[in-house]
Amino acid sequence: MAFLAGPRLLDWASSPPHLQFNKFVLTGYRPASSGSGCLRSLFYLHNELGNIYTHGLALLGFLVLVPMTMPWGQLGKDGWLGGTHCVACLAPPAGSVLYHLFMCHQGGSAVYARLLALDMCGVCLVNTLGALPIIHCTLACRPWLRPAALVGYTVLSGVAGWRALTAPSTSARLRAFGWQAAARLLVFGARGVGLGSGAPGSLPCYLRMDALALLGGLVNVARLPERWGPGRFDYWGNSHQIMHLLSVGSILQLHAGVVPDLLWAAHHACPRD
């Protein structure tokens, strides 16, 4: 991937203040670059290259995998949920790639703030749109409750998204999504004790989905493993790259659960009261 001679890279102390968010990554920072210079950084080694490619390759894979494995012809009136699911799967890696690729733009902190907001929007979309099919299927046989639950979760997501966009730190952004996670756990619990419905194998996928996402967030906040060896993980294997890989796994688990859930909802007949 890295086969061009790049510019002279900066150390942490020489990098712009808005890029000094991980004091344990000591080297490999790109200098301020034009848009074309940012694109050129796809082809030389720097400390954001792993972040760009982990989500860039995932995005390309999801663009093929998610629409092709969605049984559109069998979803009937629930086809819109297939569309929201596709957006939920594609938004996080798309926002992430743009953020990491252009974060060294010569526009400085103003451009960086917009890119960070775009990245957070991707996370907000997967947390919001990703849960709608889950709630829809869990409450498939409770039509009086389902609309209220969908609207309530959407409103909650709007509040969480705003808090994440205005959060002053990585840990604050992680906490901003806590209420959404709690709401999803409530839905999972309802399904687990028989108060909700859905495909039999989907619930374990959803539990793994949130477990991977939470683990990735905690690793990123803790700055592990680079905290144990500052400078040793500047290019490969640092906490943010680990979080990226775990988030890809989380999205795959979401997809593995939603597809059978939507198929189940399309063919299941609820018992009459």
Curated annotation (Swiss-Prot):
Disulfide bonds: none annotated. It is a multi-pass membrane protein. Keywords: Golgi apparatus, Membrane, Transmembrane, Transmembrane helix. Plays a role in maintaining adipose tissue function through the regulation of ceramide levels. Mediates the stability of ceramide synthetases, CERS2 and CERS5, and their activities. This is Progestin and adipoQ receptor family member 4. Induction: Expression is up-regulated in subcutaneous white adipose tissue of obese individuals. One of its GO terms (biological process) is protein stabilization. Interacts with CERS2 and CERS5; the interaction regulates CERS2 and CERS5 stabilities and activities and is inhibited in presence of ceramides. InterPro entries: AdipoR/HlyIII-related (IPR004254). GO terms for molecular function: molecular adaptor activity. It is found in: Golgi apparatus membrane. Relatively widely expressed in a range of tissues. Expressed in subcutaneous white adipose tissue. Belongs to the ADIPOR family. The chain crosses the membrane at residues 52-72, 79-99, 115-135, 147-167, 185-205, 245-265. PANTHER family: ADIPOR/PROGESTIN RECEPTOR-RELATED, PROGESTIN AND ADIPOQ RECEPTOR FAMILY MEMBER 4. GO terms for cellular component: Golgi membrane.
